[in-house]
Amino acid sequence: MLHQTALFPPVSWFRQLAQCQAEAYIDTRENFRKQTIRNRYTIATATGPQTLSVPVEGSKHANICDIRISDHNNWRRLHWQALATAYGSSPFFEYYADDIEPFFHKRTPQENAESRYNWDFLLQYNMEIIETLCDIIGIKAPQLLPHDDALTVPLVTAGVQSAPGEIRIDGQSEPELKPYYQVFQSRQGFLPDMSILDLLFNMGPESILVLKDLPPLIP
């Protein structure tokens, strides 16, 4: 199964990964697309959904591997503040904070050099986030697809098949996501398909059970 890269991916993305019986890969050959889950994620707040974006540098037609993260607008501090405000009272925010907060600190060149992934690049930043989240949830993390590999598996891009070998989640045709506890559910109702952080901060170790109990994305 071939997935597009995603920043703190939505629950539906992890639902497919948790239920997948085959090897999962992250596509490294696609061109970057603006205003997608590649560099943005949505959280549930007291006033409703809030989308957080990571600013990037590079042409809109550039390969995803070449997209650099920008330091514009001090986004790291703003994102962490938004998460702390939205989920500070959730059951498992403090439990996972030490695992998640480091992703909102800029690495030094030496730290990047000593790490498996260089956080100056969006794809590598996303990959370390995904591996960390998979380890927390208890599922096998996908691998980066080598550039020279032929596409022999379906591409899951976020649930209707829109092109040969591609399955796209458009937010309308995907199978219904079963509600789970959310902090502001009494005010907003259940907000489906938020970032996986929403599920983790609210459900903790039971997140894997929620993911496996959801209707399969691909029958």
Where are these regions (language model features)?
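Residues lining hydrophobic/aromatic ligand-binding pockets adjacent to catalytic sites
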Residues: 1-219
